Amino acid sequence: MPQQFEQPQAQQAATQEDDALATTQAAAQTESADQADVLDDILDDIESTLETNAEEYVNSFVQKGGE
């Protein structure tokens, strides 16, 4: 008879672990999506800068003289 009560507890623990894993995965996916959005914004900014004045952008990285 005690075995009958242990099985639902084990199932409940497994369900709680599954719920915790699902929550963690959802949070990780949300964070990844946010990071991808930030990266896209940075790349868009670089692209627009290059479209408007690529030469000035590149020259800002070129060393001059003894720099």
Curated annotation (Swiss-Prot):
Pathway: Protein degradation; proteasomal Pup-dependent pathway. Signal peptide: none annotated. InterPro entries: Ubiquitin-like_Pup. It comes from the Bacteria. GO terms for molecular function: proteasome binding; protein tag activity. There is a cross-link at E67 (Isoglutamyl lysine isopeptide (Glu-Lys) (interchain with K-? in acceptor proteins)). The keyword Transmembrane helix does not apply. Residues 23-61 are annotated as: ARC ATPase binding. Strongly interacts with the proteasome-associated ATPase ARC through a hydrophobic interface; the interacting region of Pup lies in its C-terminal half. There is one Pup binding site per ARC hexamer ring. Belongs to the prokaryotic ubiquitin-like protein family. Protein modifier that is covalently attached to lysine residues of substrate proteins, thereby targeting them for proteasomal degradation. The tagging system is termed pupylation. HAMAP family: Pup (MF_02106). This is Prokaryotic ubiquitin-like protein Pup. It comes from Bifidobacterium longum (strain DJO10A). The gene is pup.
